[in-house]
């Protein structure tokens, strides 16, 4: 109901005023619909909002330059153009390269999900279009943002390094090198801590779960110093904060994506997309030391 004629979406719904966010906010209708289907077997959101998804993707494409999504304008209903949101101090969420790689990886993932949705809905004619767009964008992401000499993407933050691997933009021949570089950055630059914001936590946990990297996540979760979940608890938090230092909201959903890691990685319970609603699922616990 909130979608504009040109396909633009607000960052919140209902939309009584100009709210801040970025592509992850207004494009959420795509992963939300897909994950509802995968986890509950409920197709209704996909059926109802498939045309909305298509229209929004067209809107995003209208702001592509040389094959990459670039900043769209603020409007009376939507402000800002975020990549990640509220990472720890010392990480610049306004770094243009970081914003661009995060948002283009998200768009690439959206193409892939819409192709899957089209298959489920029997819209076979649409599938090649979205698959081709996804492959082209993945290629462009790697071409533009990868520094071959240093084996790093964009600003080399955790989300910048992980997201291209998660969406398949990183060639398989370079995957081991990029992963090693990620671990180097995490251990050195970030002193073994989680170093992402709202968007990055979900990306980090998805990648770690898929790649059996439970020790990597667990090592960061054990840290009691800033930034981290135990730091929140040790400083009186009973719910997750909006920022790692607790400066803003004390009741927020910014970092809640870590919850899925306990279920899907530690317990190892993951759905089978081919049998949605847990009609068939996998149990593959990823045990950690300590």
Please tell me what each predicted stretch does.
Residues 1-11, 39-103, 120-163, 223, ...:
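Active-site acid/base region of carbohydrate-active enzymes
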Residues 14-26, 86-106, 143-161, 167-169, ...:
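Solvent-exposed loop and edge beta-strand segments that line ligand/cofactor-binding
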Residues 22-29, 46, 53, 100, ...:
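Active-site-proximal structural scaffolding
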Residues 28-31, 35, 48, 52-55, ...:
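Extracytoplasmic/secreted proteins, especially bacterial periplasmic and envelope-associated proteins
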Residues 29-45, 106-124, 162-173, 203-211, ...:
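Well-ordered alpha-helical scaffold segments within catalytic/enzyme domains
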Residues 62, 115, 142-143, 184-187, ...:
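Amphipathic alpha-helical segments of tetratricopeptide repeats
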Residues 132, 215-290:
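Non-catalytic C-terminal accessory modules of carbohydrate-active enzymes
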Residues 174-183:
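Alpha-helical repeat scaffolds
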